[in-house]
Amino acid sequence: MEHKRDPKRYHTGINDNLVPLEPLDLSKINDFDDMLRAQSLTAFGGRTVGEAVDTLFEMASDKDTFVILTLSGAMTPAKMGLLVCDMIDKGYAHAVVSTGALITHGFVESSGGVHFKHNPKMSDLELYRKGYNRICNVIELEKSLDDIEKIIHEVLDQFDKDAVSSSRILTKALGKWLADNVPGRGILKSAYFKHVPVYIPADTDSEIGLDVYLYMIRSVIEGKKPFGFNPFLDLQHYAELVNQQKKIAIITIGGGVPRNWAQQIAPLLELIQGRLPKGKAPGHIHGIRFSYGLRICPESVNWGGLSGCPYSEGVSWGKMDPDGTFTEVLEDATVVWPWIFKATIQRFEKNGLTIQKNFELKDQLKRVNELMRQYKLA
């Protein structure tokens, strides 16, 4: 069948409700919000970065939306830690799911340690001999890791050895230590003051995990009772917290385990409803899917990894609302995350708005603790 265009039937774009693009006019740009708002009316990656501000602003403005921030990649030695602090302090994030390494390097900085620029003239063998651990073009001192091991063991000394712990309990305790001993800012310190839980699903895959393991082994060698550690307590706590929400959103920095662990909550709640014995499944559990998502990660979808898969793939798993609002920025987070977040902050300020939510996180956490006492995982 031959297809021909009829010039008499050409559309104008406007009659199909297409949005006109606009030239980027630097003479009209006064701040980050102006720049990214203008970029949202351009094309390609620039447009996506601009649209990311729209999505972040919308999820933060939605009074019923609980936001989960997931973190992977070396964001803290890359000096992005204060962005996380601000997202917690300003109410953009109500729960954090992170790699253990990211929390480890952040704790180094929070407790007074310093990261350095890597000198490419130094070989990796030379770095090893001098106690310089390389993370791409950043140096983490082995001495700094030794220093935080002492702090972690000091904190663990205060744990009730008859109780069962988890990563959330440990990160809260470390946040309290920072609050009691360090004047500066820190991710775990902000989380402690704002009652934001911090989960580390792959907690053994990090320096903090190794420190906890060494503490437990040393306890056994010294004839002391090691405390119990159950990662399923984190999953249960997170499930009960998310289950209380009307709507949920996810901000994905990178991908990996934190992203999947956070997203799988939707099918988990569905499985609890459908697969536990009838009459014995928790009656208060309800289904929920993510209504908003903002992902900043350069990984391509064709590699097949979770870090690169689009949110739309999550619809097939029952994780994402097919009618939700999602933006994915395929860029290095250290480049665009500060722009996106600063532009969103400015947009709130310019409109005379603050983040207001219809829930009190502290009250919800109290309810979670009450519900968890009904189970025997601990």
Predicted regions and their residues:
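Short glycine-rich or small-residue beta-strand-to-loop segments that form or flank ligand, phosphate
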Residues: 66-74, 97-98, 250-251, 294
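Short acidic, glycine/serine/threonine-rich loops at helix termini
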Residues: 79-82, 107-113, 210-214, 262-265, ...
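Ligand-binding beta-strand-loop-alpha-helix segment within the catalytic cores
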Residues: 126-208
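N-terminal glycine-rich anion-binding loop in soluble enzyme alpha/beta folds
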Residues: 1-54, 59-60
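A generic, well-ordered mixed alpha/beta core segment in the N-terminal half of proteins
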Residues: 84-149
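C-terminal functional extensions of proteins
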Residues: 2-16, 47, 240, 247, ...
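Active-site rim loops that border cofactor/substrate pockets in soluble metabolic enzymes
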Residues: 201-248, 258
